[in-house]
């Protein structure tokens, strides 16, 4: 008896890590500037030299996963997008305090190492890191036979960023009357998929079903990768736009995430129907007979990221990010009431 007969192929794992190292080195060669990495992939730990120019640097850490969106990717056989999702979920969180992503680590757990699928995941992770301007510094691939069924895997990601202490964004910067501007999502991103899967299953739709008016089947629309907002925010930072706060709209939707960048005595007042709801959300609401407030509490509904800025910065923000749109303002919180006001005035998602 040996380890391979127990379900763990050491040689295949070694070849997989070698391939990752080659891909990372190729990705670094294509990127501009110094990576700051010391050594390479495959050691016990990854090393990265802190960039110069910081007077009082603060390191910022975040971790996340992709959730049950992975189930659709594994059924549909498309895995690259969830690699991008993994990076996006972590770097977008780190970004909310004003940090620049520095490096990323991944964890892949699977019942049986299947390189064809996992290469797609790694390529997606590298693509996400390149877009976010950070390095893939290391990771872990765990082959766990008997724990995960064949063909199944789970992902976790870890990101560390850096920000000048004086530039850290927290709720103390947010003022009453500040305006809320949204950056559009690319779709469902990586949240709400347990409800998505239940709706699709109970309605009996196959993943290759293409609803009327759609240009792609359900699986491809729902697997659209999470948008990475690093470059958009860095454009604002470089232009000196006074960012008072930022919120990444993930699990729990706007009601759960927007208050996280506000002070306890503050609330967000949303203007009803201030943006069009993308069709995939309207389809899910109709197919699942989901109430409007439940939709807000589950999905991003087209708002992937929220910027809190003073009113005098609105015109400059609009010129720098034409895709951004205003959704409301910061108002006093009402004792015993929701920290996100105006949702009850929406009624239907369609005006």
Curated annotation (Swiss-Prot):
Keyword presence, Nucleotide-binding: yes
CDD domains referenced in this protein's UniProt entry, alphabetically: PurM
Keywords: ATP-binding, Cytoplasm, Ligase, Nucleotide-binding, Purine biosynthesis
UniProt superkingdom: Bacteria
Entry annotated with the keyword Nucleus: no
Phylogenetic placement of the source organism: Bacteria, Bacillati, Cyanobacteriota, Cyanophyceae, Synechococcales
Gene Ontology cellular-component terms listed: cytosol
Protein name: Phosphoribosylformylglycinamidine cyclo-ligase
SUPFAM superfamilies from the UniProt entry: PurM C-terminal domain-like, PurM N-terminal domain-like
Family: Belongs to the AIR synthase family.
Major subcellular site: cytoplasm
Gene Ontology biological-process entries: 'de novo' IMP biosynthetic process; adenine biosynthetic process
InterPro entries linked: PurM-like_C_dom (IPR010918), PurM-like_C_sf (IPR036676), PurM-like_N (IPR016188), PurM-like_N_sf (IPR036921), PurM_cligase (IPR004733)
